[in-house]
Amino acid sequence: RIMNDSGFVRLRRLSTDELVGTEKSAGLIERYFSLMPEGDTALQDIDLSAREMRIGDNRLCLHTLSDAEDMPGKVVTDIRYEKLSTDRSDCRLSFASPVGLLLSCNHIYNQYVIIDNSEENLQKFEKSARNMQSLSRYSRSNSINREWIDQYLNEAHSYGLTSVRAHFNVMAWSDDAEELKHIKNDVGSQLASMECVPRHNTIDCPTLYWAAMPGNAAD
């Protein structure tokens, strides 16, 4: 709904054949379970061990962004790509392009935007702001937090913004253990280039893999 309301792009729901496949072609779910994005797919054993998840010969590594403290102070829709920009012209890419097209390894970038009851959330923030106001005499940080909450509420009411929750993760894989070490570093470096704090997940990798299955991304 958010994407369609922007007027710039349109999203559509995938058909059943596109999800589960047909007799002649593999569907998105089948390709996801085998980590084979194109061509013929083969059945693969899946090891959901907490310390190391494997699908066939491939080992997975996963990085997440789910805490506001891990995000940069300012998030924009697009950034200047220096390598293709000049003094007279800018090459603009998506803010998340470092973990998308610019990440040169086998990977999947998952992005979840959960639309909650916005009015209910704003009421919770109003209550939190009043609590911060009452506690501001005990700590300057409470006063600062109240100002941030007030600023958020003012913008939400002024521009009719919808309150959402979001989660992002990058799932990468390789059949070579040594290469996987370099991939972990590359993913972390790309997240750091976005001024985000990289968080390498190990224990909950199988859970997040299962949650990212096409059609299984509900809250």
Language model features: what each stretch is:
Residues R1-D219:
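Extended, folded cores of ATP/NTP-driven motor/assembly subunits in large transport
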